[in-house]
Amino acid sequence: LVVLAYQVWYLSPSIPITSFLKSEQASHLLSGKPVVTLSGTRNMWIKAQEKIAEMLKKHNAPIVANVALTDRHHNHISVLTIVHWLFTGKKDRYLGIFPKAGVSEKDMASASLYGEMVLKQMQIGIYTPDLQKEIVAQGGVQIRPFLLSAEKKANRLFGIWARLIYGSPRRKFLLKCFHAYLYLAIWILMPIVWLFYWITYPL
């Protein structure tokens, strides 16, 4: 059994884990082995997980369980707290009123429960679909319909930006444009889309 923990960068698997999974070493280590994937993100991880699954499939390494720990607070609150954490290095209550950033200590402490679930099936030597169902039931994976919808759209847009910026002689200018786009998307477009989604869902 392999426990594969990875980071998500801009809705995709990080460059280090992607580079590893595309290496000959990964093929040697993972071939034919069951894999448990583990990620800790702000709130969007599904598209990255799909890409991880595709790369593991090429190594004949089936995913038998996935644990995706996230910041459970409101999207825009988590933006503020994560930025505070990143730029100060302090994982405290921003301004004394906001919650702590990232995955909660409670969720991290409870992660051992998922390990016990995996261990039971590992000792038997058979991994069944019930394992993932148990993890979901215990909160090891949460899917929010609105965030999933937003993530799919953002993933496509990030791909467009990446193709525009990579190798461009106007790289610095385009990066500034991307920076401005992120602010626009997070603080203006997302609330509008969320309101429209809230009004129409589940119509």
Question: What role is predicted for each listed range?
Answer:
Residues V2-L203:
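FMN-binding flavodoxin-like domain, especially the glycine-rich phosphate-binding loop
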